[in-house]
Amino acid sequence: MFGLGAPELILILILALIIFGPGKLPEVGRALGKGIREFKNATNSVTEEIKEAAKIDDGNNNSDKEKATRQAS
């Protein structure tokens, strides 16, 4: 996971606890989780759009090739 071991993760958690405090830490964790989830959804959406565009392009290229083959015959 990003080359982070247990000692690094513990250090990050301790720093977060010092910076945000124990009362605010769950709220920060929820917000961070929500942000990561939204980012993943957005990247998945873009990936799917690119795949769909590639499929459409492949379909158009194949039909153009077929037309060229028919015209050459």
From Swiss-Prot:
Q: Does the keyword DNA damage apply?
A: no
Annotated stretches, region: Disordered: 52-73
Q: Which GO terms describe its molecular function?
A: protein transmembrane transporter activity
The record describes its membrane topology as: Single-pass membrane protein
Q: Which Gene3D superfamilies match?
A: 1.20.5.3310
| Subunit record text | Forms a complex with TatC.
The record, for InterPro entries, names: TatA/B/E, TatA/E
Q: Which family does it belong to?
A: Belongs to the TatA/E family.
Q: Which organism is it from?
A: Moorella thermoacetica (strain ATCC 39073 / JCM 9320)
Principal localisation: membrane
According to its UniProt entry, one GO biological process term is: protein transport by the Tat complex
What role is this protein assigned? Part of the twin-arginine translocation (Tat) system that transports large folded proteins containing a characteristic twin-arginine motif in their signal peptide across membranes. TatA could form the protein-conducting channel of the Tat system.
Protein localization:
Cell membrane
Cited HAMAP family: TatA_E
Record's keyword terms, sorted? Cell membrane, Membrane, Protein transport, Translocation, Transmembrane, Transmembrane helix, Transport
List residues traversing the bilayer: 1-21
What name appears for this protein in its UniProt entry? Sec-independent protein translocase protein TatA
